[in-house]
């Protein structure tokens, strides 16, 4: 096989143990905090019918325009690898006739055909929260949830919350027309992408990272000038709730989201540490999404967090569990080790047991590299006496224990190790 074909596909990568542990830590933190806010876990398929996204994300979005992985199946349907989770979860809400209000949490990979760069791959992972049937008071609550996640990951000092409101449909339409007139005057200076967006959705130009576009944006109208009284009151209410919760924020009048289903409040937690990929958590309100999919009028708000981006910012060191390794020095010892390992695993102990060890010195080196706490040595002499030689890997001290008492001995060692870890954590927190 061609060696090049053994490499991960461009825009994807392998996750080795330490990074997997960090991903799982972020997932577990997100799930735990989500549960405190009443969110329950769900999962959707990795691939969906293309229409799930064509009818919801908007023709002007980059995802629809050039980033979806689509393919025909053998039945003639066009399927896509999910490029985001919100529309997929909304489809599930309708299909499964879930009771409202519904607070749903998802975690998993999504796929976009983008130019790979730091923290931006073609396969990446998201934590995702959707609150269907949510009134406007839920906007601040979702931002509080995200703020709590960042706090649990010790990232609050790394990010800044930016918020804005897109108002209602009338204000967006008026603002769109005003932007169109403004950008048409500067069309010759816009980037190629922005000239394309000018014909489809000029609001998307506000999200441009092109330096020339950014200079033009300085003089562009802002949407706040087009709010009606209700939109002003709603957005002021969101800001008052954030103030009441003590969550710092900045109003960014040019903040929009990249998908057409957003309306009302939008927000992003941004960092300056990741270059152009500055949004680590982002979301907003999408009151018309479910209706656009044929599911009725369901107000909703949600957000997604990029796991790769959070992982690149978060400091995390996986604490290995207490573990032991059997080092049997013969076939009979290997059979005894296998039985004992099975019993220890039944007690919840992490056990490595790889068969006969030809040389004890090499076996001890392997045990040390594996990071185990105890090496359990079984030779002919130990088998004859019904004993195990327990070597403490940190000190080198050795102790003989009867095979019949091995379970209690190792369980006691594990309990002591857990107690020491808790004491160390408590001391570090003082």
Swiss-Prot record:
> Can you cite an annotated GO cellular component?
cytoplasm
Q: What class of enzyme is it?
A: ligase
- Its catalytic activity? tRNA(His) + L-histidine + ATP = L-histidyl-tRNA(His) + AMP + diphosphate + H(+)
**What keywords sit in the KW lines?**
Aminoacyl-tRNA synthetase, ATP-binding, Cytoplasm, Ligase, Nucleotide-binding, Protein biosynthesis
One Gene Ontology MF term: ATP binding
- Pfam families found in the cross-reference section: HGTP_anticodon, tRNA-synt_His
In Gene Ontology terms, what is a biological process of this protein? histidyl-tRNA aminoacylation
Keyword Protein biosynthesis among UniProt keywords = yes
EC numbers, comma separated? 6.1.1.21
Q: Which branch of life, at top level?
A: Bacteria
Q: Where in the cell is it found?
A: Cytoplasm
Protein family per UniProt: Belongs to the class-II aminoacyl-tRNA synthetase family.
Report the NCBIfam families cross-referenced here.
hisS
Q: How does it assemble?
A: Homodimer.
What is the name listed in the Swiss-Prot or TrEMBL entry for this protein?
Histidine--tRNA ligase
Please name the taxonomic classification of the source: Bacteria, Pseudomonadati, Pseudomonadota, Alphaproteobacteria, Rickettsiales
